[in-house]
Amino acid sequence: MMGVGVTLCIIGLICIAISLLLPSTIDSALMKALQDVTMLDTKESLAYSVFANNSEYPIGLSVYFMNLTNPDEVLQGGIPELQEIGPYNYKEYRVAYNVSWDDQHTTLSYRYYTTFQFDEETSASSDSDVVINWNPNVFPFWFVYKQVGPLLPTLGQKLYEGFQLPEYSTDESRAFMKRSLREYIFGYPNDPLLALLAQEGFAPSPDYSGVIRNFTSFEDFNKNAKQDAMRTGYPEIRDLRKVVLSQDSTTVCEDSDEMIDGTDGGAFPRPVKRTDRPKLFAASFYRNVELEYVGDSEVYGVKTLRFILPESMWRNSPENQEKYSQIWNGAVNVTACTKSIPTLLTRPRFGKGRNPSQDFTDPALIAQSNVKWLDDNVATDTYFDIEPITGGSMNISSSSQAVWPFDVITVPDANGVSHTFLQNIRPMNYVPVFWARQFISVSTKDAADFRSNVYGMMDAEEAIFAAGLSLGILLCVIAAVVLNIGYGFYYSYKNRTSVVPEFDSVANNYAKVGEEAGTGPEPVHLDQSTSFARHGGATYGSTVYVKNPFTGETMPLSNATMDAAGSYSSSNATYL
């Protein structure tokens, strides 16, 4: 019986050990598989195939434009009246060229060929709609000249010369661009003012490149695309997608000394907890930021944690006093990174519709224009829904609003005589021009595969742990009971030469000497002493047979001897 108990105990301990060790083995195997899938260290990795060409997973782009409805009044000093129109939806496709790895395959360098395809079916209207707002062919060059005019007198002279061109001969054509939305956002070829400025090297080409880069040809790409680089996740997976080079710069922008520190948002060091502050390089804001957790979320059944841009990023002082001469609360000033063009980035619609306690866009900025916003529930926040086990972003939405100023323009002619244009306009009057939202999410199929593979293995891991631990504990409990009973028998009858009597039959408490029980002529009484007593002094040999009360079998007592008093003793008289 004690042997049975020991065996059960050993089996139980083995089950407990398996329940403790196997899940960690499964977890390690799962993480290794996920690591192999997400790393970018070779062209054979699954993640690289999507990274290098996202034709199966295009990024969504929604553009909302602020159409100026009172240009004549603005030229006479009136407050701009704007009507928000949209969305104009596009699919963004990226193909990586000039791909290379360092010798250790820890860093991946590339250039993206980016194009946008209009999605008319989901858009509010056609992107051939004519829109009007701030002129991106005029004001950027004016602000450069305004800042460094004495060093670049020729720039001012070329602007004056350009204002004599038929296409720019009126204040309206100088102050406003009136084009199709697609041309305004993505550019058009052969602008006469840019052609004039390009002759002196002030403009890169006669083509207006737009406010969002959309390469029109491979030649355009080769000439204008810049290099990016990121960590591949090898050998340290926690470095996966950490940006090391953005648009040829290792700093947040060319005119900054702050080194890039954060991922591109596609993944973060795993595991991700609610108390974490994942580091992001927000390229559109030229900022390193630490994201803030705001709540749990779910993407097609995959449980995620939602993180947003920190509220402190939008504050003027003291959090961002050193950041590019912040002007107003609620507006990120990226002027230094856009090469002297006054550029503010704000929350879309200045944060309209957000929690009032978090809406601190400076009223002085909002009051510089009147905007009729669309009444819809479209998401305007920038957020990342991060799967905490893998650190991968399952759903991303990134939004910002571009705000640029109108201004009075004064430039010299070839003789050095100054001329003022737009003299009645409100100087440095900031207006929102457009806002855009980029978004991407895992597909329903990918989410289902993730749930099946990752959650399936985790469920198996939990089931093995629970079953193994429960079975192990149960077997150990049974073993303890068996051992306790067995030890009780052993303790009660240790050192005795008799077996446990069968109380239901006195006859069964007798055995025969010299023969098997029931066959010899004289019985031997199994008394409760430490010996076998028999009547008479005859000897029947050295073997005494007794009946085992547990099995019913007749068993020999080896080395049985009889002393002068007629008592037998044996070395194996106790049976348990």
Please give the residue ranges for each predicted region:
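Extracellular or lumenal secretory-pathway regions
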Residues: 1-303, 310-518, 545-546
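Non-transmembrane, juxtamembrane loop and terminal tail segments
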Residues: 494-562, 572-575
